[in-house]
Amino acid sequence: MGLLKIVVCSGMKILMLGEGLNRKGGIVSVQKLILEQADSMVEIDHIATLVDGSPIKKSQAFLKALFDLSRNLLLGDVDLVHIHVSERGSAFRQSFTTLISKLFGKPVVMHTHGSEFHEFYNHLPAFLRIVLGWIYRKCDRFIVLSESWKEFYVEALKLKEQNVSVLPNSVRIPDQVPQRGDGHDGKVLFVFFGRIGQRKGAFDLVRSLLHLPERDRARLWLVMAGDGEADQLRDLVSELGLDSTVTIKDWISPQEREALSKKACVFVLPSYNEGLPMALLEAMSWGLAVITTPVGGIPGLIKHKENGILVEPGDTYQLASAIRLLIENEALRSDLGRAARESVLPFGADSYWKALTDIYSSTIYSSTTAKRTATNR
């Protein structure tokens, strides 16, 4: 997907760069939420810097993105460039878009999402760390998902603390959530939504079920949905004899995810690395009890046994204990789910949009003021 016109208006004019909107994942969800919130005072044009397909198709899309960016900066009345970035190839692609934007004298807001950026950055050769840090410091403002990520970027990349804003991801808050009771069709439905692979602990989750007593496993139904290594996970489920307990789905639509969220009692995400996962926020908004891990921005949101249960990444015995606790304790499930929903009410779309537009306005103002000061010298 190339250039996408969202709103035409007379207020702030923003170029947003990020993954194509037809891709899957949390970054795309964040972009769509922002674009849906754009109002009469903000015009947002979206440029896709990454699309699905072969390496040739991806390269062609990125070159087109650079052309669209340059053309808009040259011909359009652009006030600010908002760049979504993660790790690995994304970090280098968006380094080019940052440099082009600054070459045209435009303020840049870099919006970071990479759950493994710290590992990626720390394993780069020293020269590339220096170059990447230099480019990132060219950005006028940084948006991170949690205080822990702010500390990392300030310390590792030597960003100015006052230029780094913490803005947790937004989430749509359902008006009402169902009364969940004691499970669905005699079983307690647990769900996992996200990329299926080791980083999000999908294989650990399946293996942990072997540690459950048979009576608890008989009451459990686990549905896992996502892209990635779904076939490998199906093989593991069959190998462990858990076909009657675990259902593996490929990536499902938002409507299917909503339907499952209404039926489910518990959301599980035993990740090794995260930013602040959209799937977690969405599950909490539906009032699901949550089992997850204290990684990335999660411990800033989840307090153990207050609005969720935290287990250590990779500890399948601890994970099984948490699962067993919530299978057997309906009251605790209800209390944790209610507290989880209350915790994400401040993350609603209206509050998020106000915070984001405040960042836009202050960044544009600071950039304009700095240019005037430099001109008057």
Q: Whereabouts are the PLM-identified features?
A:
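Conserved donor-binding/catalytic core segment of Leloir-type glycosyltransferases
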Residues: L15-L17, D182-L209, V223
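Short hydrophobic beta-strand element within catalytic cores of glycosyltransferases
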Residues: A289-T292
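Conserved acidic donor-binding segment of nucleotide-sugar-dependent glycosyltransferases
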Residues: H304-K305, I309-T316, L325-E330, L345
